[in-house]
Amino acid sequence: MIQIVKSSELEKDWFSGRTFTGTNEVVQSVIEDVIQNGDKALHLYGEKFDVSSPKDFLIPESELKAAAENLKKHSPDVYDAICYSHELAYKFALKQKDSFDDFEVELTPGMFTGQNTIPVEKAGVYVPAGRFPLVSTVVMTVTPAVAAGVKEIVLCTPPRVHPEDKAAAEKAGTGIPGKPFTGGKPYADEGIMAAAYICGVKKCYACGGSQAVAAMAYGTESIPAVDVIVGPGNKFVAAAKKMVFGKVGIDMVAGPTEVFIIADSSADPAWVAADLLAQAEHDVVAQPVMATDDELFARKVSDEIEKQLVLLSTAQTARASIDSCGKIIVCNSLKEAAEIANKKAPEHLELAMKEGSERDDIQNIVCNYGSLFIGHYAAEVFGDYAAGLNHTLPTSGAARYTGGLSVRMFLKTVTTLRAQNGSEGMKKSAAAAGFLGDAEGLAAHANAARIRL
């Protein structure tokens, strides 16, 4: 059962960012192996960790198209949902891109300073496919790259046994964890392949884990090196992204998912419980939290969690999360709840409150969150799937200093300078640069400025 505590009982450690250790040495070894041995290393780790280790890694575009057509035929509702999600995400990303204006301004006579926004040339996307192949993650990671104007998008996702190889795999007793089918055709989860095609991916590789991150960072014979890598993954993928940062850009090092709900007594306990469980089912260490100033409401939500939980197919995972990481905080006021939320800096923050001045006040107080969901009808799962927002968000307190994945990740803001010979501004800048070069003891700097006078 979820723990109910008073705000005064919260321990300092609860506000600390959560870290998961024990991966660095293993992942560093994988990265070094991929750098030295390329595709050979990828095959080795595929045989060690995956259900399939294909002969080649690149999935033909025709296979992606076939997966999309198959999804449209047999699951039209899911196909349409992916298309709708992609459409909204693309519109939102374009709106974000439009907010980054290019300009040139004459700050002083004859000195023109400017700003240009340029897309990166190559972007790598990692899409996990463990217990729950995350079709929506394809939309959230690929779409902003497309909107940014990235020329080449490389998507890596764990391999699956190709349909044409399944008979051979079954006969050999392979194609299962611990006994991979080797040498077959490259293939992946069909939903991920379909979503990749819908979103415009042309290069999809059947390669997963930290080895895929290393391959995208450094390049192999088959998988090209990229400029940035985005997308979620397990602790090994997260560690690999952290280690390759610097060689490439990364979106963030994300941990287990979180939701923090500030609820008043007008909220429906069933709705709040449903939102908490939607996070809890992700992972046994997911962190579902609610804060309220109404103790009776807190107990109603707790009871509703128990009613709904037993009906879930994901009950085992959700139960572990609720019992070990879940929390309902009874506060002295909703303002205090907002202050606690700011200190926690959650991935998702919901204001399950009736419309009015109090909700407006709380909305003005909260400032540390990945995404904010305002009011009873703005369900967090809408942001997960189909509202235009990106669901790749900062966790473990990182919302204190950064936002989520956006089109910005795939854009570089660079600056320019143009100077008119003999202008007043050029003379003043040259003189100032000369004096500052002298002050810092950098004679060549001073000379490079004064030589133009």
Q: Which stretches of residues belong to each language-model region?
A:
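Short internal beta-strands
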Residues: K151-R160, P288-E295, G375
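C-terminal core of ALDH-fold dehydrogenases
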Residues: K343-L453
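Conserved NAD(P)+-binding/catalytic subdomain of aldehyde/semialdehyde dehydrogenases
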Residues: T174, Y197-Q287
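N-terminal Rossmann-like NAD(P)+-binding subdomain of aldehyde/semialdehyde dehydrogenases
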Residues: M1-E121
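Conserved small-residue-rich beta-alpha loop and adjacent elements
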Residues: V105-E190
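Short acidic-hydrophobic, aromatic-tinged amphipathic segments that line or gate anion-handling sites
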Residues: Q3-S8, K203-G208, I328-S333
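A glycine- and small/hydrophobic-rich beta-loop-beta segment
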Residues: H282, M290-Y369
